[in-house]
Curated annotation (Swiss-Prot):
Name of this protein: NADH-ubiquinone oxidoreductase chain 4
Entry keyword annotation includes Transport: yes
Species the sequence originates in: Yarrowia lipolytica (strain CLIB 122 / E 150) (Yeast)
Predominant place of localization: mitochondrion
Gene label: ND4
Subunit structure comment from the entry: Complex I is composed of 37 different subunits.
Length: 486
């Protein structure tokens, strides 16, 4: 009843705000900062020594309508957090206000709807990381699709219609296999609760059926080779907020789904199919890195580099080692800081000034925009995985975990470090080095708002790289729970 009252009050307040003739983006920014403060309070009160889910609540429970978390009666949608979910929740609440700030002055058409969609997507992803049962996870997993579809379709570039349908067609088709697996789990176990699934042991044949359905959905969402072609198209046509959310948060749902859905319940099937995953991850890392070298669209270059980094994260999370699993989470979070910052540069700052994303038109940014050139160099080194950055910690541990599990695949995967340096330094040299291009002109350098966003993201990835113990304290119990011995 209490939660219902909050929901009704929020809907009424939201309706009144939309009826207001002023701009609602200030309210949404204020609300997102309040949400950040609330999650920080939860983080402070989170017990890192506990091996159980905390801050639990339940919705739509007809047998327990008051949503008491300590009740044994449960037929509703469960929500709660542990160290893993809290890590990604912190990433989410940090990126939401920064994403709102990214297009603060550039949306002239129906800006209220734009900021509403951005905040709504962020809230859905936040609840997705909070979900403790398969049904609520799937509902929220899919709820981002129509919102992202509308955002890209209305506010995207010239070919936004094709990009929006790519999002819907690819991800929805893959998620149907997840739905079938969840139905099988519900029928066999008579529960969809994450908390209880460690109590069950399934046959290998049944695990295989469920695992394949879940992995297909995760493979599309990551995305992995050969179902990765939709992401560069979507990034190239998305508005800035769409690219920042897609790279920073939505791709992390796939990594989170492996840790939350596959490893605890389907460990034997995971062992069986790990060689296949390693081959797919290796192909994803190498082929997308090589494809990056041939691209001329700035956003497509960053999109392909994101796919390559996620391939490394998948390699680590499937290594069945604490180093690999921890490294994959660190890499996922660090990528959630660096990639949105790069999209802000290429899809926000440069495109706003020069209205072109083709890399050949840019040269010698140090002449006209020296501060932006400095940010490009710093973020390029962070994206490569330079020491003291979170990307270095995540990639090093993920590759080490992969090497421990399979020395051949792990060793070959290390070529990703060289390829990342080649394509990222090539891009950086193109943008910042040499004499300024004839297509460029003197314009405003980085504004205070843009500096603030990039400084927050850079400082965040440096904190993870210099003090990885911060995340390790949160993830200790979670990571060790996912190590299995067969």
């Amino acid at each position: 009843m209490f939660l219902t009252s909050i929901l009704l009050s929020s809907l009424y307040l939201f309706n009144r705000i939309l009826a207001w003739q002023g701009n609602v983006k200030h309210f949404y920014l204020f609300a997102s900062n309040l949400l950040l403060l609330f999650i920080v309070v939860l983080y402070i009160n989170f017990n890192t020594f506990s091996n159980s889910f905390q801050f639990n609540f339940e919705l739509f429970n007809s047998l327990n309508p008051f949503g008491l978390s300590n009740s044994d009666i449960s037929n509703g949608l469960l929500f709660g957090i542990d160290g893993l979910s809290l890590t990604f929740i912190l990433l989410t609440v940090l990126l939401i206000p920064l994403t709102l700030l990214g297009n603060w002055y550039n949306i002239n058409f129906n800006s209220n709807l734009y900021y509403t969609l951005v905040l709504a997507i962020g809230l859905v992803i936040l609840l997705n990381f909070w979900a403790l049962d398969y049904i609520s996870f799937y509902i929220l997993f899919e709820a981002t699709l129509p919102l992202l579809f509308i955002l890209i379709h209305i506010y995207g570039s010239s070919d936004s219609e094709r990009a929006s349908f790519y999002v819907l067609m690819f991800t929805l088709s893959g998620s149907l296999f997840m739905l079938l697996s969840i139905v099988v789990i519900s029928i066999v176990l008579n529960t969809t609760n994450f908390i209880n699934h460690n109590l069950f042991v399934l046959s290998l044949d049944l695990q295989t059926i469920i695992w394949l359905g879940l992995f297909i959905a995760i493979m599309v969402k990551t995305p992995l080779f050969p179902i990765h072609v939709w992401l560069p198209v979507v990034h190239s046509e998305s508005p800035l907020a769409g690219s920042m959310i897609l790279a920073g948060l939505i791709l992390k749902l796939a990594l989170y789904a492996i840790l939350r859905l596959l490893l605890p319940l389907l460990c034997e099937a995971q062992i069986l199919y790990t060689p296949m995953i390693y081959i797919i991850s290796l192909l994803t890392i190498i082929l997308t890195s090589l494809a990056t070298l041939r691209q001329i669209d700035l956003k497509v270059i960053i999109a392909y580099s994101s796919i390559s980094h996620m391939g490394i994260a998948i390699l680590g999370v499937c290594s069945n080692t604490s180093l690999g699993i921890y490294g994959s989470i660190v890499l996922g979070v660090a990528h959630g800081f660096v990639s949105p910052a790069l999209f802000l540069i290429v899809g926000g700052i440069l495109y706003d000034r020069y209205h072109i994303r083709i890399v050949n038109y840019y040269k010698g940014l140090t002449t006209y925009m020296p501060q932006l050139a400095t940010y490009i160099i710093i973020l390029s080194f962070a994206n490569i995985g330079t020491p003291l950055t979170g990307n270095f910690t995540g990639e090093f541990l993920s590759l080490q975990g992969g090497f421990i599990r399979n020395p051949i695949i792990g060793g070959i995967s290390c070529i990703s470090v060289l390829l990342a340096a080649i394509y990222q330094l090539k891009l950086t040299n193109k943008l910042t080095g040499g004499i300024s291009s004839i297509y460029m002109h003197r314009t405003n350098d980085v504004t205070i708002r843009e500096k603030f966003i990039m400084n927050i993201l850079i400082i965040s990835t440096l904190i993870i790289g210099i003090c990885p113990q911060i995340m390790y304290n949160l993830l200790y119990w979670t990571v060790n729970n996912y190590i299995y011995i067969i």
